[in-house]
Design a protein with these regions (language model features):
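Compact, glycine-rich, soluble single-domain proteins
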Residues: 2-134
Length: 134
């Protein structure tokens, strides 16, 4: 039996990131359960520009992700409880190497690799969304 990709609806509220260049708007799918966190973008084709997956984790703590069964390279953007970005890491396709946040994070945004640089997103920038409660 072939594994199936998890496709979630795009949240009606965009995620905004305030950067030095201004606000960036992304349409996101939101994962907020352990089952959804475990599946993430596994078996999915590459995300288009302007799209992402927002992981709402249970606690603000050091987060560790991996790219198992994820065929597309990603930028992983880790943010604290207040939405401030604490680190940005790159994930390589299908790798089981651990990708840790540098500091405690409550939110993780996955976008296509290169999107963070293209959009000017850097540590210290702030993510805003109805689910991010500072």
């Amino acid at each position: 039996v072939a594994e199936q990709a998890m496709i979630l609806p795009v949240d009606p509220d965009p995620l905004l990131i305030t950067t030095s260049k201004g606000d960036v708007r992304l349409d996101v799918e939101v994962t907020d359960t352990q089952v959804e966190h475990a599946r993430g973008l596994m078996f999915r084709p590459p995300l288009p520009q302007g799209r992402g997956m927002l992981f709402v984790m249970g606690e603000e703590e050091l987060q560790v992700f991996w790219m198992r069964n994820t065929p597309s390279p990603l930028d992983l953007i880790f943010a604290a409880k207040d939405g401030s970005i604490v680190s940005i890491k790159q994930g390589e396709p299908l790798s089981e190497a651990q990708i840790p946040s540098d500091k405690p994070a409550k939110y993780v945004l996955e976008v296509a690799q290169g999107e963070a640089a293209r959009l000017g997103i850097q540590p210290g920038d702030r993510m805003r969304h109805r689910l991010i409660q500072p």
